[in-house]
A protein has these predicted regions:
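Hydrophobic, membrane-inserted alpha-helices
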Residues: 31, 47-54, 149-153
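Membrane-embedded catalytic cores of phosphoryl/pyrophosphoryl-handling enzymes
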Residues: 95-208
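Membrane-interface loops
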Residues: 12-15, 48-49, 55-135, 206
């Protein structure tokens, strides 16, 4: 009985939230949300990771490069393993895009895009601090990138390919993943190397 009640509660929650989000659909808004959700597609993410990793490598910021790339690879692997563990099927109705073949929970778009946005924001903020720019600009950077990451998650509900609990699960995974990894990274590399002359880079440790 307890399991059945819990399943009913989750189903009701998913139906209520999905209905509310999808009630916002309009012919004008739909193409924009579809474009937004496509930013989290594997091809888009791979291209962005390659570009950012290449830039960090070009600047010879190997510690930042390994931290950024390793974080995302680890997160992708974790999400895919969890999908195979839970084997929850995706929604089949009210779809605006093709239904992916993979399992539904947790949402890879929600988890990985939020992780990537937070990591990019962190790297940008460390660069800003190296140039002693305002705290207000740092706060704005966090707000913008977190909003983008969350918006991609919500877009998955909007286009109908994920349950709301999938998205919430993805966000929870992102937060659980980011807290220890960022804490460790900042403890190992407390000062940013962005903006420093090349000769000064040797003063800072790099990952083996």
């Amino acid at each position: 009985m307890c399991i059945r009640d819990r399943a009913d509660w989750v189903a009701e929650f998913n139906a209520t939230i999905a209905g509310s989000v999808q009630s916002l659909r309009t012919n004008e808004l739909n193409p924009w949300v579809i474009m937004l959700t496509s930013l989290g597609n594997p091809t888009s993410v791979i291209i962005m990771v390659i570009l950012i990793a290449s830039l960090l490598g070009f600047l010879r910021h190997w510690d930042d490069d390994i931290f950024f790339t390793g974080n995302l690879i680890g997160a992708v692997v974790l999400v895919q393993v969890l999908k195979l563990c839970y084997t929850i099927e995706r929604p089949t109705e009210n779809l605006l895009i093709a239904r992916p073949e993979s399992f539904s929970f947790p949402s890879a778009h929600s988890a990985c895009c939020l992780i990537m946005c937070c990591l990019v924001a962190l790297l940008i903020i460390r660069a800003l601090r190296a140039h002693q720019l305002s705290v207000g600009l740092e706060v704005l950077t966090w707000i913008v990138f977190i909003a983008i990451g969350l918006s991609i998650g919500i877009s998955r509900i909007y286009v109908g390919v994920h349950w709301p609990t999938d998205v919430l699960g993805g966000w929870l995974i992102a937060a659980t993943w980011l807290f220890p990894t960022i804490t460790w990274y900042l403890s190992q590399y407390p000062r940013s190397r962005f903006g420093l002359p090349h000769a000064q880079h040797e003063e800072y440790p790099v990952l083996p």
